């Protein structure tokens, strides 16, 4: 028999240090066990703090749901792909649903913006902290790891499902997810760029994310030695937005467009716009960046919209920049 952890429990485990990134097994839904108090106790004995969030697991049919203290059952009447976490001496498995199944499950519980942010995390090389605050009551910073899945894999899994509300929500969210984000800052910038105008974003289309570690002073990037930088590249428009965690631009200097080679490995010259974290936080600076990118696509960002774009932009920025 198999106890398969799901939903918020699976997400917290993926954010922990004990979660293996290999060992996928096919779990027949007939083998899903009915959770017992012993299962909950075994889960609570894992070497991470689990007391602050409930145990979510999947069962094969509604009659197998149980009112277990500290547990919650969800029905998933189909075979699934899961990662084997532990195996008992009796041969029973403790598994965690795959990232693809997790994304679809969370589509029923998260808002669109939250689901897109989760997609960036699953398809990126970073994890947000578990839901256990430090002494100040604030979650700790993100950690590095290999990507758990990709946009292509998430889409492939969704295609195999029915046409319920979860699938529709997940399909919409994946329109705005990009592979390869390595930090929450990259996710923030990319989300603001790709969300449509009606949501308060810039509607600039989905870019690719490229990374570069600068080993010496680089006047083109305006970086100091050892800074990590990334670029959002719109290849079809021949333009990129280059970000670095350190910059020496003047306090009131707006981002500028310059012509240079974006990546030596690509052998292509693009127009690059250098920005810093301060530019992302200042709406007028990021408006300037978005306008330059839009011109690279041969269009202008309209201001005379039928709806109040300024208020929607403020609401979106508040959710994206202040909710990590």
Feature names for model-found ranges:
Residues 1-166, 190, 298-301, 305, ...:
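Short gly/ser-rich loop at a beta-strand->alpha-helix junction or flexible surface loop bordering the NTP-binding
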Residues 142-324:
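Surface segments flanking catalytic/ligand-binding clefts of nucleic-acid enzymes
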